[in-house]
């Protein structure tokens, strides 16, 4: 298998900084595709093998790690006080950011995600393997609306 590591590197170095500017490294549930997400001083990382992990970015200490549904290739995104993680089986899991692993909701579409969601205002743009969806929050108490674009 491919060696996967997450590195924290001080940004002020020049040249080969391997011995002088690497703050920490971790091999704990690191994915091949998704980018890490920094929210309110915590670093969130998803792994291909159904894990979601929260790190202390200054030290690399694991705050928590837990299993999530499906396999993720898309990067997690943060919007409106929540973290959204889409998987290859079509589920989007919604998390509360923080030092405790807390799932708020799971929503499922017919096809899986490889692409990361895009956020614009109150709208989410979700590209599955077969469709492009736009999901938008309506004014308070009115729920959400969704539209789908066929290829």
Map each language-model feature to its residues.
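Noncatalytic, solvent-exposed loop/strand surfaces
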Residues: 1-151
């Amino acid at each position: 298998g491919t060696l996967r590591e997450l590195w924290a590197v001080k940004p002020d170095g020049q040249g080969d900084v391997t011995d002088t500017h690497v703050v920490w490294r971790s091999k704990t549930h690191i994915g091949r595709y998704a980018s890490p997400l920094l929210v309110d001083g915590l670093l969130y990382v998803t792994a291909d093998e159904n894990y979601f992990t929260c790190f202390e970015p200054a030290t690399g200490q694991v705050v928590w790690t837990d299993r999530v549904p499906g396999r993720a290739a898309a990067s997690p995104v943060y919007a409106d006080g929540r973290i959204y993680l889409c998987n290859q089986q079509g589920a989007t899991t919604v998390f509360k950011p923080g030092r405790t692993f807390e799932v708020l909701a799971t929503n499922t579409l017919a096809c899986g995600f490889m692409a990361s969601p895009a956020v614009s205002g109150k709208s989410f743009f979700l590209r599955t393997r077969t469709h492009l969806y736009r999901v938008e929050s309506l004014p308070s108490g009115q729920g959400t609306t969704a539209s789908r674009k066929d290829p």
